[in-house]
Amino acid sequence: MVKVPLGNRSYEIQIASGVLARLGRECARRKLGERCAIITDTNVGRHFAKPAFDSLVRAGFAPVLVIVPAGEEAKSLKTVHACYDQLAAHRLERKSFIVALGGGVVGDLAGFVAATYLRGIAFVQVPTTLLAQVDSSVGGKVGVNLKAGKNLVGAFYQPRLVLCDLDTLRTLPEREFRAGLAEVIKYGIIYDARLFARLERDLPKLLRREHAALADIVARCCQIKAEVVGQDETEGGLRAILNFGHTIGHALEAISHYGKFLHGEAIAIGQTLAARLSARQTGLPQRDAIRISNVLAAAGLPNCVRLTQRQRERLFAAMHLDKKVSGGEIKFVLARRIGEVVWGQRVPEVAICRVLDSRLD
């Protein structure tokens, strides 16, 4: 169990096999409300809506099931409005709560619905993908996309509980699982050189989804995220390090209309390019930049991208809409060495063009 230390808003991250069966009991113990809704998507719902629903019923709740389309395109204000309508139709009140059952899209969407419906009701995260378990379910960032860019509408709104059931990873498609490894690798780059070295050594165990290896890695990633969020909840400084690779990654997602790349795949490309920028601007040793590229490739993730001139123009336009832009300047998180990064680094467009054209030898 990992605790996110936020004073009277602190909460637990429970990580184990079979914790989904405890959902109802844990919600009842926390007295989250009298009524509840499960928000899930068409893919996850097939596997896990019934056990979640049954657990809540056993604890005395009468849950409402809200099913949204699967995929990044569902992370929109249109879907938010549809969720509001269903909650209102079933007369959920202030003393109600939402269960976000799914991956990062569902967690961000359902969390934003919880943050804004009736000016805020409680919610619980039940992440069912590796990416969501190690990253997006923890820390309270919730929101949706606009056509112009990713996560441009959102809030900081903490869950009351995070339940990471490792059994849910068994049904995860291989591509989705590998995409989640991008965020796992990120934690080694930004915070923990020993974790990075372990990933270089033990990546085959993770790719085989060995339970002990997964449990340890998910817990360590959650510990790092909890430590960072506990010090800087609303990204005034330190929390920005969690965005390593995300400036370019989010822009890639936006210009491909959230269809070509999974989130983790785009972030993997962004991390490789951020490592190249780091080698040029913040003294990251070239051998470390190569290690970053190699471990991403070993995880089966893309570490390069080819863009036409028109696509580059659109990429820069999307990056200028990034939340980290200040005074019209694109700001990056860059690495000094594996395990240590700096944030708020100004990077001129010409430098980004150079790394887009470069290769690591």
Model-derived regions: residue spans:
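ATP/NTP phosphate-donor binding region
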Residues: 1-97
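Residue-level signal for inorganic ion chemistry
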Residues: 16, 38, 76, 127, ...
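C-terminal charged capping/lid subdomain of soluble metabolic enzymes
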Residues: 182-184, 283-361
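A glycine/threonine-rich phosphate-anchoring loop and its flanking beta-alpha core
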Residues: 112-205
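Non-catalytic interfacial helical region
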Residues: 84-101, 110-125
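Active-site segments that bind and position negatively charged phosphate/pyrophosphate groups
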Residues: 197-313
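Solvent-exposed alpha-helices and their adjacent loops that cap or buttress functional pockets
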Residues: 5, 31, 91-93, 116-118, ...
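Short glycine/serine/threonine-rich phosphate/pyrophosphate-binding segments
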Residues: 105-112, 133-134, 250-251
